[in-house]
Amino acid sequence: MGLPVAFIKNMREILGEEGLAEYLDSFEKPKFTGLRVNTSKISVEEFLRISPFKLCRVPWTENGFYYTEEDSPTHHPYYYAGLYYIQEPSAMAPAAVLPVERGERVLDLCAAPGGKATELGAKLNHTGLLVANDASASRTKALLKNLEVFGIPNLLVTSEMGDRLDRYFHEYFDKILIDAQCSGEGMFRKQAHMIPAWEKQGPEVFANMQREILRQAAELLKPGGTMLYSTCTFSKLENEGSIDGFLAEHPEFTLEEIPRQEGFCSGMPELVGSRFPLERCVRLFPHKIDGEGHFLALLKKAGEKIPGAPEPAGRPGRIPAELEAFLQDVSMPMELSRIVVKDTRVFLMPEGVGRCPGLRFLRSGLYLGELLKKRFEPSQAFAMALKKEEYASVIDLSAADDRVIRYLKGETLEIEDGESSRPEGWQLVCVDGYPLGWGKLIRGTLRNKYFSGWRMNA
């Protein structure tokens, strides 16, 4: 592989001659593939019990595992049930390091396609608020799908610049993750097409963007809050340089220690002549770990964290009769006062979120479904947010049952007597106890209501 001369020179400065040789040798290593268990749906122990894959734990996260490409986990029904996310192993580190607690307000500022946002949502586990933002509107569609597959209800998906978010969310968030757009040097081993892009638009361009993103994030973080900055590049300008410049302009922030794992290397303040303790940052290199590479910096904002008072729920609005009838079969906890009807579409809004006129939303809350003529049609997102026991009538199929694949392809199914909780009407279709979507049972025939845009081979 032809690496740019300027890149080799930069890596020699970072690694020295011996380290550079080891790094270059890593291009002969196999590329590592990983999956991360969705702990808001299934425990790691239970997943390991039912998993058909050969898995080996990723050291820096409790719910991440290496798998072999022969296993093809993206073709298994458990993937469609949202039990795991496919993610490059070193990219699991940022969300693992950011200490998210249940009930907090969390922002993923550069969230698409959702690898880190899905883990932040799983950590919140149906509590608090997750705002998943990406400035690129075209990338937010994949982001929304991944969050909905994971069954995360307490979310806003936005497409804004950080300064626009600040109009509505100034010093609002307890935790912020910034996985900044970067020159992508950590992807050279895996995606050689990144190299020509690096030659056209190198670290200098991205470093300026990253410092602006950090500045915007600082305004969105509560006093006492914590934010995690990460990149998938090795550049000193984008890593230590960006953090050094930020700390020089923001004395209210300090660098926090990141717990070390085997293969984690310390940041290198000497690369940029910094007076700050940048050795508290972490560098991941492909010749030190089984992964592609990352940089992490954990930053804390001075001040006392004041618990955010949730916005008053207000009076319950009038729930349409069709929706009320459907919800009688649903036992998922929800405040009816947070249900909002927009034209014919019905949403369950997260706690503590007011009106944000002018903000570009792709999704505001959990999309429950649509009011049609004298009936309510539940959404795919609603099914994914439920647990099997939270709906009155269920068809639970084994992963080995060929009807599961047929269901995921959008086909009509024949259901035997006793296979459904009720003989007619809406059914929550599950695989081994985990929801996949909806179906409507009529005289032994299940009309397929799986969302057409998510179908297998769609």
Q: PLM ranges: what are they?
A:
Residues 101-102, 166-179:
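A short acidic, Gly/Pro-enriched loop at the edge of an enzyme's catalytic core
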Residues 1-48, 292-295, 302-458:
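Polybasic, low-complexity RNA-engagement segments
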Residues 173, 226-229, 234-347, 352:
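Class I S-adenosyl-L-methionine
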Residues 124-125, 221-223:
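Helix-to-beta-strand junctions that scaffold the AdoMet/dcAdoMet cofactor pocket
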Residues 113-126:
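Conserved SAM-binding loop of SAM-dependent methyltransferases across substrates and taxa
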Residues 103-112:
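Conserved class I S-adenosyl-L-methionine
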Residues 138, 175-216, 232-239, 265-270:
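Mobile active-site "lid"/loop adjacent to the S-adenosyl-L-methionine
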Residues 133-171:
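S-adenosyl-L-methionine
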